[in-house]
């Protein structure tokens, strides 16, 4: 429906799959957008697109919203008591800087934007395994590896503390504890955790011998940093 609607304009919608759509026809400097992950749980009005094409986008997005509202699929969803899919959020556009080598040799993530940037900069990409045991032997031997664990993003954005705690507990069991053991066993040189609040926590192998330092639970450290 949306693709047919936009075919009558100078824009073209490409739906590569159910999760990722791409809009063609806008110059990259005409519309400045915000990633959906930064908007979830916040007032949408504070993050609406800006730029020379913002008014045009708002007009067409309103028309698309009306089309979606009356679409048979949404009527069926409403009859089943499900939320309506009645809006479109645009983000991810931009101008690539000059090509540069990635700081990571391997990137494990499912986010299409991150994977695209990794491939563009020369890094190998793959989906994250279910746990640390699924990493190939020697995956991080002598090279930097980026692992993106983002299952807790929605819970953090919407303030769902229980779900966030459950997901992070799985991270602790499946990832953090095994990777710490690998660091202690000299299979890794260092670990660096980048939290949702932007803080970085780096642990080198030699830090494990600093027994005089008082241990702090990582959850307490995150809470203190966010206070």
Q: Could you say what each language-model-derived stretch is?
A:
Residues 1-227:
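…; additionally, a secondary subgroup of soluble metalloenzymes is captured
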